[in-house]
Amino acid sequence: MLLDNDILVDAGTGVADLSLTELSLIDHVFLTHSHLDHVASIPFMVDTVGGMRDQPLTLWAVPATLEILRNHIFNWSIWPDFSQIPSPDKPFLRYREIQVGDTVELKKRKVTALPANHVVPAVGYHLDSGKGSLVFTGDTTTNDPLWAIVNKIANLKYLIIETAFCNRERELAVISKHLCPSMLAEELAKLERSAEIYITHLKPGEIELTMQEIEEDAGQYRPRMLQNNQVFEF
């Protein structure tokens, strides 16, 4: 998800849809967690545009996620350590830690890390322009601490929330700490703010079924499927 031209939230395979110019304008990447579908494009992105930029690309994530990237991707075995090249004092990549509750302010926009409940350390993000807010839950299952915070966001306009499994796979959703439509309905019942709700993280082979079940279980909240290249103004 691209915020304006310079902030990216997660870096999955969809980043490949961006042009070289668009990639080069991104200064900050806020990661929700370390799973491959959320970090896969970072190595190629840094390698592609690092030499075109006059400052490092900054990765923001919880300490556990940054440690995984250092140890398992940017380790010289899988990919070069771009936090050390071309030189340690002028690298292509730099790491910055963020914890739940921390807010980073970038050109009057605020990015705040939200609690997530997943199988690895993870966060969601609250993006606040000052005029409006968008909440992206990231990968999560049942998450009461999230709603306690979201319900205090007075200018909330959009909520993007995952639903990774259909109802017949509820047990798998519980084990893997995701949501299915019946669980989504239980979570949305905790939302006390008015917001447009969009569904993400749908499995490609189950999109139609899952969205049908979402309509049946949570239709009163009017959730819609997040579309490629969808634009939100806030």
Where in the sequence are the language-model features?
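Active-site beta-strand termini and strand-to-loop segments that position acidic
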Residues: 1-5, 106, 126-130
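Divalent metal-coordination and catalytic microenvironments
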Residues: 1, 10, 33, 69, ...
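Cap/insert and terminal regions of metallo-dependent hydrolase folds
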Residues: 143-231
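Structured loop/turn residues at beta-strand edges in well-structured enzyme cores
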Residues: 24, 91, 109, 154, ...
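Active-site neighborhood of phospho(di)ester-bond hydrolases with catalytic His/Asp-centered motifs
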Residues: 9-12, 27-37, 60-62, 135-140, ...
